[in-house]
Design a protein with these regions (language model features):
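Active-site acidic/histidine proton-transfer and metal-coordination neighborhood
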Residues: 59, 76-161
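Intrinsic, low-complexity polybasic segments
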Residues: 34, 162-163
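N-terminal pre-domain/capping segments
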Residues: 1-94
Length: 163
């Protein structure tokens, strides 16, 4: 395995010269980069047409893909409904990633809210385990879950790993 380098989403520099995300793989290849992270931070809203076209363009330009799941995922929410919704957002992300040929999704874990870090971690581990189990049952075993912290004091982080 080797390190991959590329942006998450499109930069202002990209937007000056290019119009659509489908042009990103060619742009990145020309810059000597080899990866692109498709952003779904505000919800998974990628059509089959765009997903399949991006998959083709990425392959044409030797660019690997990942997908950033929605920012409103909360693996450690005290509300079971929010944790269940988070699982659904993760599954939607797996589906979109699979359609575009991405092999991993990036997931923010959420905050510790009004509970201890230890309790938040236990809730997050349970939620992520249930999400992974369901993803595998739905045929997304090829999608790697990549938990990511946001670097804020109240965010759950530094030791949440899924193996």
């Amino acid at each position: 395995m080797s390190a991959k380098f590329g942006p998450a989403g499109n930069s202002e520099a990209f937007s000056i010269k290019y119009k659509t995300t489908l042009q990103a793989p060619g742009y990145l290849e020309a810059m000597g980069l080899d990866h692109y992270e498709y952003q779904c931070g505000r919800g998974v809203k990628v059509s089959d047409k765009i997903a399949f076209a991006l998959k083709d363009k990425a392959k044409e330009h030797n660019i690997t893909l990942s997908l950033h799941a929605p920012y409103f995922i909360s693996l450690s929410s005290l509300e079971a409904e929010k944790r269940d919704n988070s699982i659904n957002y993760i599954l939607q992300s797996c589906d979109a990633a699979s359609r575009m040929g991405a092999d991993r999704i990036v997931i923010h874990s959420g905050s510790c809210a009004k509970i201890s870090r230890e309790d938040a971690l236990e809730l997050a581990k349970d939620t992520l385990t249930r999400a992974r189990k369901t993803a595998v049952e739905q045929g997304f075993e090829h999608i790697v879950f990549c938990p990511e912290t946001m670097g804020k004091v109240n965010q759950l982080g530094n030791c949440l790993l899924y193996t």
